């Protein structure tokens, strides 16, 4: 239950599989490059490209977290996030969502088995809502709101 106490500020457009980080030779630092920017001390990163929405998520050891998404027309969504991860279910190798909301509780790691995804423009950004069911058939809702940033 430790993971449920972790706080997430925002939600992601879809549940994502965490990608492996590349390790630098002779150093303990993990690095990952997103849109030409290299991040060091990376704890976890995500790369997803479903439903025409590309999303990349990077968490660094100092707690700085950057998420960016690319819509098909070349407009980027970018937001700095606060991040928590479900450590009680296999840690960084698991599927995860940001801020999955159940009617009666919050849980931070779930792989949707079914559901619908709606993406719409909203106040200079995009709003993404996923209604779905988790592995146990329990309903959940996931939300992402992000501003538009030119690449």
Locate each region found by the language model.
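Sec-dependent bacterial lipoprotein signal peptides
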Residues: 1-19
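N-terminal cationic leader/targeting segments used for protein routing and processing
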Residues: 3, 30-31, 121-122
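Bacterial Sec-dependent N-terminal signal peptides
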Residues: 15-41
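Short, hydrophobic/aromatic-rich segments at coil-to-beta transitions
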Residues: 27-29, 52-54, 123-129
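Surface-exposed helix/loop patches within compact recognition domains
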Residues: 43-122
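C-terminal or internal capping secondary-structure element at the end of a domain, subdomain, or sheet
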Residues: 119-151
């Amino acid at each position: 239950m430790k993971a449920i106490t972790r706080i997430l500020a925002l939600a992601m457009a879809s549940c994502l599989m965490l990608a492996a980080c590349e390790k630098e030779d002779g150093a303990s630092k993990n690095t990952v490059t997103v849109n030409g920017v290299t991040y060091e001390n990376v704890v976890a990163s995500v790369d997803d490209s479903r439903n025409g929405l590309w999303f990349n998520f990077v968490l660094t050891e100092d707690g700085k977290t950057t998420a960016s998404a690319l819509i098909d027309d070349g407009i980027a969504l970018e937001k700095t996030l606060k991040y928590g991860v479900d450590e009680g279910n296999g840690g960084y190798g698991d599927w995860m969502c940001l801020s999955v909301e159940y009617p009666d509780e919050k849980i931070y790691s779930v792989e949707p088995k079914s559901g619908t995804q709606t993406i719409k423009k909203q106040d200079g950004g995009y709003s993404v809502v996923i209604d779905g069911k988790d592995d146990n058939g329990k309903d959940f809702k996931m939300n992402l709101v992000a501003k538009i940033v030119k690449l």
